[in-house]
Curated annotation (Swiss-Prot), chain B:
Subunit and partners: Interacts with IL7R and CSF2RG.
Molecular function terms from GO: cytokine activity; growth factor activity; interleukin-7 receptor binding
Function: Hematopoietic cytokine that plays an essential role in the development, expansion, and survival of naive and memory T-cells and B-cells thereby regulating the number of mature lymphocytes and maintaining lymphoid homeostasis. Mechanistically, exerts its biological effects through a receptor composed of IL7RA subunit and the cytokine receptor common subunit gamma/CSF2RG.
Disordered as annotated region, ranges: 118-143
GO biological process: bone resorption; immune response; interleukin-7-mediated signaling pathway; negative regulation of apoptotic process; positive regulation of B cell proliferation; positive regulation of T cell differentiation
Family of this protein: Belongs to the IL-7/IL-9 family.
Signal peptide as annotated in the record: 1-25
Gene3D superfamilies assigned to the protein according to its UniProt record, in alphabetical order: 1.20.1250.50
Assigned keywords, A-Z: Cytokine, Disulfide bond, Glycoprotein, Growth factor, Secreted, Signal
One Pfam family linked to the record: IL7
Protein name: Interleukin-7
Length: 458, 176
């Protein structure tokens, strides 16, 4: 009885020791043999409907795998373990019974003896299927290339979100791959970033997006080759655009030329009108003096003239007497001319039909002969014979401070006195001077001088 | 001395072995980020829902199972444990292999995630009949198709409860 109890107790404890957690088998084989049977695996989910594929292979390709088998245990549905199938040097398992939750253990067995084991999680060694149907389409209007491809994972339930890597290179640059990562199946490449008239190669691969499923890069898709256009769009310039650009160029050139040619005469006076120079204006209005004209105020130059001193009051009386005499009518043109000659500034007293002479008593040393006013034509004086006689009817800026009109004026037009030289009297024959008086009288009505009239006379 | 050795050999160790499962019946929910549920369990639950919708025309009576077991606070793991075991009962039905595959995935996946140490060997697994006591009155006159219909209805409700309870667990984990 004692022996029986001892035997049962010993057996009981041995059963406990055996049934307890013994750890991984690989811990028992922690020796040099572990390295000989090192292997790597990857999984592919839903390769055929609901079936998954697990593939394992030895890292050492020279290993003799004749009697070696692979087994997976744990994280399986309704079974404890499954055995791999061998195909050449690869071991694969195609099944629906992956739980996809939790860890599994893959062991290398030699004649049902575990040589090496490794803990793996099926969802962490996922290798997606390679993309396919890579296409490149050139869009002429947008000057870019649209790259599209397809992947079987778009229809899967588990591994749906992937990161795709598109790699392209110019065929003559063997190792200069350009890479682009994206999550969609469409990519746009700009034409300006590619070499013109060059042959390109492009391919795509995928990897699970690191959320729950992780793993490795898929195999590369079949390469697609395409050629970029010869030029970057210069050879295919729109003819309408070209025509417009040429016309615009010539228009601008013509405008610049005209601007340069007409600048001084036409454009500048409008844009930047110059201020009238009184001296020059007067010079222009009056006749230019002859070169041999003696314009000196030296009394000796007036020796030929008879100089008579004029009594101021007497001169005034005489002027008034002239003005009171009725004047015969004259043609309109001459009226206008004389009217222009008789225009006065606003400072003139309006009651005067004529002009009140302003004589400095005793200061004007000389005066011209009456009736011979033409001798005393002063340079630069305003004349009805000025070049702008046609225009002077409106606003001929004639300013007279002194004008003594009387009989004996010649038939010629009235030579006006120099505006700012009081004391110089010019006489005009009355017979012909009647229209002058008339013009003088009527000139008061429209008598005003503006600077603009100076400008116009230029 | 014989009595002492006999007691220690055959008395205490079995007692320890029996008492340990009762003392430690906690479930430790692994995969707390919800990745396993969202990427595996929910996929299979949705597939089962789609497969059941083709056949079902369910009544609105709530089975007694849910009156006894519910996803109350601090009892979520216990409810999922029982619900997952209940799913196994449906494997005996005359259903397609893919349907069974999804059921097994949901059931075993849930139990794996719960990682409950209580094995419950002494408990009799609940049968389908307990869930629908009203069926006792209908069994006399119902055909096999009607029975199957009822089972599918119960399964549909069970799956919805499992899904709701999982969402509650994950929502609670995110809030913490």
């Amino acid at each position: 009885m004692t022996l029986l109890s001892i035997a049962l107790g010993t057996l009981f404890y041995l059963l406990q020791a055996v049934s307890g957690e013994s750890g991984y088998a690989e811990n028992d084989f922690d020796d040099a043999e572990l390295d000989d049977y090192s292997f790597s695996c990857y999984s592919q989910l839903e390769v055929d409907g609901l079936q998954h594929l697990l593939t394992c292979m030895f890292d050492d390709s020279d290993i003799n795998s004749t009697n070696l088998e692979f087994e997976i245990c744990g994280a399986l549905l309704d079974v404890d373990c499954l055995n791999f199938n061998k195909l050449q040097e690869r071991y694969f398992l195609k099944t629906k019974k992956f739980l996809l939750i939790g860890d599994s253990k893959i062991c290398v067995k030699l004649e049902k003896k575990n040589m090496t084991c490794r803990k793996v999680n099926i969802v962490k060694i996922v290798k997606p299927e390679a993309p396919f149907d890579v296409r490149v389409v050139y869009r002429e209007g947008a000057n870019d290339f649209v790259v599209t491809f397809n992947t079987s994972h778009l229809q899967k339930k588990y591994v749906k979100v992937l990161i795709h890597e598109v790699a392209y290179r110019q065929e003559k640059n063997e190792n200069n791959w350009m890479r682009v990562n994206l999550t969609s199946t469409k990519l746009t490449l700009l034409q300006r970033k590619l070499q013109p008239n060059a042959m390109y190669e492009i391919k795509v691969r995928s990897i699970p997006y690191a959320n729950y499923f992780e793993g490795f890069w898929s195999e590369w898709s079949p390469s697609f080759h395409f050629r970029t256009p010869e030029t970057n769009g210069t050879g295919e310039t729109d003819p309408v655009l070209l025509t417009i650009s040429i016309l615009s160029f010539f228009s601008v050139a013509l405008m610049v030329t005209l601007a340069c040619v007409l600048w001084k005469k036409r454009i500048k006076p409008i844009i930047w009108p110059s201020l009238p120079d009184h001296k020059k204006t007067l010079e222009q209005l009056c006749k230019k003096p002859k070169k041999n004209l003696n314009v000196s105020f030296n009394p000796e130059s007036f020796l030929d003239c008879q100089i008579h001193k004029v009594d101021g009051i007497q001169a005034k009386d005489e002027a008034e007497g002239f003005l009171q005499d009725p004047l015969p009518p004259q043609p309109e043109e001459s009226d206008k001319q004389r009217f222009r000659a008789g225009m006065q500034g606003p400072s003139w007293p309006s009651e005067q039909a004529g002009i009140t002479p302003k004589i400095f008593r005793g200061e004007s040393p000389f005066r011209c002969l009456a009736g011979n006013a033409s001798v005393c034509d002063a340079p630069g004086l305003l004349s009805s014979r000025s070049p702008n006689g046609r225009e002077g009817g409106k606003s001929r800026p004639l300013v007279y401070q002194d004008l003594l009109l009387g009989p004996g004026t010649t038939n010629s037009s009235l030579p006006p006195p120099f505006p700012f030289q009081p004391g110089i009297l010019t006489l005009n024959p009355v017979a012909q001077g009647q229209p002058i008086l008339t013009s003088l009288g009527s000139s008061q009505e429209e008598a005003y001088v503006t600077m603009s009239s100076f400008y116009q006379n230029q | 001395m014989f009595h002492v050795s006999f007691r220690y050999i055959f008395g205490i160790p079995p007692l320890i072995l029996v008492l340990l499962p009762v003392a430690s019946s906690d479930c430790d929910i692994s995969g707390k980020d919800g990745g396993a549920y969202q990427n595996v369990l929910m996929v299979n639950i949705d597939d089962l829902d789609n497969m059941i919708n083709f056949d079902s025309n369910c009544l609105n009576n709530e089975p007694n199972f849910f009156k006894k077991h519910s996803c109350d606070d601090n009892k979520e793991a216990s409810f999922l444990n029982r619900a997952s075991r209940k799913l196994r009962q449906f494997l005996k039905m005359n259903i397609s292999d893919d349907f069974k595959l999804h059921l097994s995935t949901v059931s075993q996946g849930t139990l794996t995630l719960l990682n409950c140490t209580s094995k419950g060997k002494g408990r009799k697994p609940p049968s389908l009949s307990e869930a629908q006591p009203t069926k006792n009155l209908e069994e006399n006159k119902s055909s096999k198709e009607q029975k199957k219909q009822n089972d599918l209805c119960f399964l549909k409700i069970l799956l919805q409860k499992i899904k709701t309870c999982w969402n509650k667990i994950l929502r609670g984990i995110k809030e913490h």
